Amino acid sequence: MKIYVVATIAWILLQFSAWTTTDAVTSITLDLVNPTAGQYSSFVDKIRNNVKDPNLKYGGTDIAVIGPPSKGKFLRINFQSSRGTVSLGLKRDNLYVVAYLAMDNTNVNRAYYFRSEITSAELTALFPEATTANQKALEYTEDYQSIEKNAQITQED
């Protein structure tokens, strides 16, 4: 009887851990302090290689074609400078920005995100530095018109 109880508990623990695992987040960084053309080229190549599907080709060329996400839903891009780091959260399947992380004037990491594109739990996995209390959903949507309106600019500017 004890073996059945142990087996059942082990099965529940394994199932629970499978239910709660989050995709690992890939982070790619560009150091903006004295960057070189080679560093920038390497940075762009890392992004391309991370999202491309090696089995997809465009017109028989070696141009990277975005494949379905196989390494997690999001990609973290960090831009480092002498004054700090700004991080972008990108959707892996289209490279759209869904969130960003920056330190505010009080040295607190704050994450801002499009609620329709990423959940708070996914944001926590992407930017663990920003606690749930320091996450803020943006008050506008991710389409260009909404962003322009919120920034108070137009395409003519």
Swiss-Prot record:
* Keyword NAD listed: no
Keyword entries, A-Z: Hydrolase, Plant defense, Protein synthesis inhibitor, Signal, Toxin
Catalysed reactions, semicolon-separated? Endohydrolysis of the N-glycosidic bond at one specific adenosine on the 28S rRNA
Tell me a GO biological process for this protein. negative regulation of translation
* UniProt xrefs under InterPro entries: Ribosome-inact_prot_sf (IPR036041), Ribosome_inactivat_1/2 (IPR017989), Ribosome_inactivat_prot (IPR001574), Ribosome_inactivat_prot_sub1 (IPR016138)
SUPFAM superfamilies membership: Ribosome inactivating proteins (RIP) (SSF56371)
Q: What is its EC number?
A: 3.2.2.22
Q: Does the keyword Signal apply?
A: yes
State which residue ranges cross the membrane. Answer: none
Q: What class of enzyme is it?
A: hydrolase
Q: Which residues form the signal peptide?
A: 1-24
Role played: Ribosome-inactivating protein of type 1, inhibits protein synthesis in animal cells. Useful as immunotoxin for pharmacological applications.
Q: Which family does it belong to?
A: Belongs to the ribosome-inactivating protein family. Type 1 RIP subfamily.
Protein name (database record):
Ribosome-inactivating protein saporin-4
